[in-house]
Regions:
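Metal-dependent nuclease catalytic cores that hydrolyze phosphodiester bonds in DNA/RNA
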Residues: 1-116
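Mg2+/Mn2+-dependent nuclease catalytic core
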Residues: 103-171
Length: 171
């Protein structure tokens, strides 16, 4: 996949420049618009200091687990520290169901949707081509909580099909 130039617009949002010169907002920015209100309400409820502490800790854990998943799928050493070992071991069996990787941390863009970003993984999961996005959470979520995840993975499925001609059937 071609590299995309990644910049930040004046509002601090990620923008990707495609090989044709088009500038598209990130998939995460676009799908995050639906959760901004909920995050603002949560921040008001717990207070900014506590929200910053929780967000920072969750973001760091998510980055570490994401890196472990990527390394594991590349066949590289993936040794979690003591803090991440339990979470990583709870998802490792799912990683073993991933095969025939088409994209792993690769840039994708859609001229049709006018969005771009870096997809976590597109591969066969249990035998079906899937967009796989590594998420971490300290609590179970129901479908209403993850609507934006479906939008995000759907956008990557469209972008992947535009770039390769291969449809992705599972998100």
């Amino acid at each position: 996949f071609p590299k995309l130039e990644r910049t930040t617009n004046p509002d601090g949002k990620r923008v990707y420049k495609t090989p044709s010169g088009a500038a598209y907002p990130s998939v995460t920015t676009v799908t995050g618009l639906h959760t901004a209100k909920g995050i603002a309400e949560w921040r008001a409820r717990v207070g900014n200091e506590e929200a910053n502490r929780i967000s920072s800790r969750a973001s760091a854990r998510g980055t570490r687990i994401h890196s472990l998943c990527e390394s594991y799928l590349r066949g590289e050493s993936a040794e979690p520290d003591i803090f991440d070992a339990e979470m990583f071991s709870s998802i490792k069996f799912l990683l073993n169901d991933i095969d025939n990787i088409h994209a792993l941390e690769d840039p994708l863009y859609s001229d049709h949707l006018q969005v771009a970003g870096t997809v976590d993984c597109i591969a066969e999961f249990q035998g079906k081509l899937s967009v796989i996005d590594f998420k971490t959470s300290s609590r179970p979520k129901d479908r209403d909580d993850i609507h934006n995840y479906f939008m995000q993975t759907s956008a990557y499925a469209v972008a992947f099909e535009e770039r390769t001609g291969i449809p992705v059937g599972r998100m």
